């Protein structure tokens, strides 16, 4: 089933289709996301920010709300980012959406405890993908290395899955956060 997650009726249609055709689905992975490198003075900043917020925040919140009602659901995995902890100013809105999703994930974990739905946060660092634009992340770790590490952490029962620089950011104290921020945002 193909769905544009930025369109609310399509999200509802996706949920209805899955509940009718795959009612035994037990895991929701909220991994949709867009990242725009932009400056607040760009003429299209607001529209791009709105698109990022819709796709990176409203869509996964809506999907979690819908799928939490699926009787077979046992796990929700929300994908955030190492930028949830320390923002990169060139992708300020993206960083903020991932910080929102981190906070939401922590609360959702608590809220869904009574329904026996486990909520896991997957926290990737920059990986060698085209997120944000072609070639921007060349030289970063391979997705396959990240996935291998994530599966090991899932086997260990972890609920916050980190890798590489995202692990350091997730565990950083205030001084380290300030140092990271200053290095990332000269």
For each feature predicted by the language model, list its residue ranges.
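Rossmann-fold cofactor-recognition segment
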Residues: 1-9
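Residue(s) in the substrate-gating loop at a strand-loop-helix junction
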Residues: 81
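C-terminal helical subdomain
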Residues: 121-122, 129, 133-175
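Active-site loop immediately N-terminal to the catalytic Tyr-X3-Lys motif
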Residues: 88-92, 135
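Conserved mid-core segment of classical short-chain dehydrogenase/reductases
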Residues: 12, 33-50, 90
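Active-site helix of classical SDR
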Residues: 64, 97
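Active-site-adjacent segment of SDR/Rossmann-fold oxidoreductases
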Residues: 71, 86, 107-118
